[in-house]
Curated annotation (Swiss-Prot):
Keyword 4Fe-4S applies: no
Involved pathway(s): Cell wall biogenesis; peptidoglycan biosynthesis
Gene3D superfamilies: Glycogen Phosphorylase B
Compartments it resides in: Cell membrane
Name under which the protein is recorded: UDP-N-acetylglucosamine--N-acetylmuramyl-(pentapeptide) pyrophosphoryl-undecaprenol N-acetylglucosamine transferase
Length: 354
C-alpha cells in the first residue's frame, strides 16, 4: 500500500484542504498519516477523522521583531530532527504540505530523506512558511492564476483549491432546524475564521438590532468569543466553531460575511453564496487577504469592505447593497470556470509518488 504523510496547521485554513483530499487518496489506496504541532488546532481536527497524528516541535515564523524570534529557530531545528525520525520510521512514498509554520521542518526532513514533496499555496502570494519550504518541494500547487509568478523556479502548478465534498451536500432544512429559526427572513452567516475575529464580532453585535430587523443571523464567532448575554436573542444563533454542521449552515444561508482567506472564499464561490468580504488589514497580516478579496471583487464574485472603513454605516450600506444585488453575484459565480482542486492535486500526488 502507498503511504502519504500530510502536514499543515496553525489555522483551520491549513488543515481543511487536507481533509478534502483524504477520501480521494483513500480511494486511490493511500495509507494516510499526519504530522502537526503539539497544541495546534489541527490536532483535534485530524484525530477526529481517525488519522494517526504525530506531534512535533514547531516555532512560529514571524516577519516582525519579537524576542521569541531568538528561541523559535531552535524549536524549528528540533522539529526537523523529530520529523526526520518519523519519516524514516514511517517510510512514506510522498509528503503533502498545506502550509503553516509546522510544515517547514516536515518539508526539510522529507527532503533530507529524499522523499518527494507536493505543497499547496492557497493565497495569491506565498506565506512565509511556503516561501521557506519551496526550495525543498518537488511541486507547489497554487489556487490563483496570479500566483504562478510568485513561486520561485519552475515548480508552480495551477490546480485550484481542494474543497470538501460534504460541504457541497448540505441540507437547508437541517440548517434552519439547528438554528431554530421560525420566520422567513433571509439568513446571514457570519464567519470570522477558525480563530474568530474580534473586529467583526464587535461590530456585528453593536449593530444587532439593525441587522436583525432584516435578517436572521448565524454567527460563528471563534473559540471563547460567545456572548452569554445574547444566548436567547431571537433570530441570533452563535457558535464558537462548527465542523459537521457547517454544510447545513452554509446551505441555509442567503448571504455571508467573511474574512478573505483563500479557502473560505473558494468554498463560497463553489456554493455560489453572495458574500461581503472583510479582509484582514495590513496591520495584522501580510496583506494576503486584501489581494484575495481584490481578485474576487474584480471577478464580480464578492463585495469588499476594508477593515479600515468598517463602521456602522458602511457595514449596513454594504449589507443592504449585497442583498439587493444578490442575484448579480450568483450569476457571476455561476460563470466561474474554477475547478475543485481535489482531482488536479491527487493526480499530481500520483505522478510523483515514489
Amino acid at each position: 500500500m502507498k503511504k502519504i504523510i500530510m502536514t499543515g496547521g496553525g489555522t483551520a485554513g491549513h488543515v481543511t484542504p487536507n481533509l478534502a483530499l483524504v477520501p480521494e487518496l483513500k480511494k486511490l489506496g493511500y495509507e494516510i498519516k499526519y504530522i502537526g504541532s503539539i497544541e495546534g488546532i489541527e490536532r483535534k481536527i485530524i484525530e477526529r477523522e481517525g488519522i494517526e497524528y504525530f506531534p512535533i516541535s514547531s516555532g512560529k515564523l514571524r516577519r516582525y521583531f519579537d524576542l521569541k524570534n531568538f528561541s523559535d529557530p531552535f524549536k524549528v531545528l528540533k522539529g526537523v530532527f523529530q520529523a526526520k525520525k518519523i519519516i524514516k520510521r514511517e517510510k512514506p512514498d510522498i509528503v503533502f504540505s498545506k502550509g503553516g509554520f509546522v510544515t517547514v521542518p516536515v518539508v526539510i526532513a522529507a527532503h533530507l530523506n529524499k522523499i518527494p514533496v507536493i505543497a499547496h499555496e492557497s493565497d495569491i502570494t506565498p506565506g512565509l512558511a511556503n516561501k521557506l519550504a519551496t526550495p525543498y518541494c518537488t511541486r507547489v500547487c497554487v489556487t490563483f492564476p496570479e500566483s504562478v509568478k510568485h513561486i520561485k523556479g519552475d515548480k508552480a502548478v495551477l490546480t485550484g483549491t481542494p474543497i470538501r465534498r460534504e460541504l457541497l451536500e448540505g441540507n437547508k432544512l437541517e440548517g434552519i432546524k439547528l438554528c431554530g429559526f421560525k420566520d422567513n427572513k433571509p439568513i446571514l452567516l457570519i464567519i470570522g475564521g477558525s480563530l474568530g475575529s474580534k473586529v467583526i464580532n464587535e461590530i456585528v453585535r453593536k449593530n444587532l438590532d439593525n441587522i436583525l430587523s432584516k435578517f436572521n443571523i448565524i454567527h460563528i464567532c471563534g473559540k471563547s468569543n460567545l456572548d452569554e448575554n445574547l444566548e436567547n436573542r431571537k433570530g441570533y444563533v452563535q457558535f464558537e466553531y462548527v465542523n459537521e454542521e457547517l454544510p447545513d449552515l452554509m446551505k441555509a444561508s442567503d448571504l455571508v460575511i467573511s474574512r478573505a482567506g483563500a479557502n473560505v472564499i473558494y468554498e463560497l464561490l463553489a456554493l455560489k453564496k453572495p458574500n461581503l468580504l472583510i479582509p484582514l488589514s495590513k496591520k495584522s497580516s501580510r496583506g494576503d487577504q486584501i489581494l484575495n478579496a481584490a481578485s474576487f471583487e474584480k471577478s464580480g464574485y464578492s463585495l469588499v469592505l476594508k477593515e479600515e472603513e468598517l463602521e456602522d454605516k458602511t457595514l449596513m450600506k454594504k449589507l443592504n447593497y449585497l442583498y439587493e444585488n444578490r442575484n448579480v453575484y450568483i450569476n457571476n459565480m455561476s460563470k466561474s470556470k474554477m475547478d475543485n482542486g481535489v482531482k488536479n492535486i491527487t493526480e499530481l500526488i500520483k505522478k510523483y509518488t515514489k
